[in-house]
Amino acid sequence: MEKSMRIKVRLLLVLITALEKVPVLVKLFLRPIANAPVISGKMKVLIRAYMGATAFDIHDVDLRNGRIGIGGVEEIMAGSIIIKLLHEILAEKMGEEKKNKALYEIGINLCKWEVSQSLGQGRWAPRVLVPLIVNSKIIDEVQSDPLMARFFKKTMNMVSRLITDEGGWGHLDFDFSSMPLKVTLVNSQEARWLPGSRKPVCHFYAGIVAGYASAISGEDLEVKEVACKSMGTPNCVFHITRKSGSRQI
């Protein structure tokens, strides 16, 4: 990483860490600013989030046209039982193995689309942050550079808070020091709706992790669920690896 970029990363880490230490200050003073009618429309999603705004604060609601989105990424809302219905109906129509592959591919394509939309709209992160978050060296950098690993983890924690935690999917925790890279999902919706399984069931969410990791790195990465709450483990754990024939993570 270039020296100038390392300086920016250090400054951002200092600022983010300082805000994390004063949650009351953030809630009482910064969140009202982040949600102010005129100012909020000109601020990036991640900036507002670090200032205490929630996903519910940041969502754009178009009542006239019946649309909702966040940072230019259009969304729809549905009951969480849709996860169970997708598993059951696709299994009935396709069989278990093809269903699992289909859900994984849906997750990949969904998340790749969301990343492309968020970057294309330019509303999620300041331009100075985009090369730090989305680049072809990111996988190697987070494993070889402790500074970059700290920064990326904090950034991913915030993105996860907005999308996963406040979106009702559960809670993600990232371990960039492990080999391979490890992602832990607490309170998985798939595991909740499909309890008592002998095999991992979170194929859709594995695809989501793979889609996001592939989109920000520019690589085709694979994700495998190695522990699943549906099987009785405390949480669901995913490993991120490069496809066979390429460099391993």
Q: Can you say where each PLM-predicted feature lies in the sequence?
A:
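Flexible helix-coil linker/hinge segments at domain or subdomain boundaries
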Residues: 217-219, 248-249
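Active-site helix/loop of acyl-thioester processing domains in fatty-acid/polyketide metabolism
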Residues: 203-218
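Non-catalytic recognition/regulatory regions in large multidomain proteins
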Residues: 182, 186-187, 208, 212
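N-terminal accessory segment detector
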Residues: 1-182, 188-203, 229-235, 241-249
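Residue-level detector of functional hotspots within protein domains
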Residues: 158, 209-212, 224
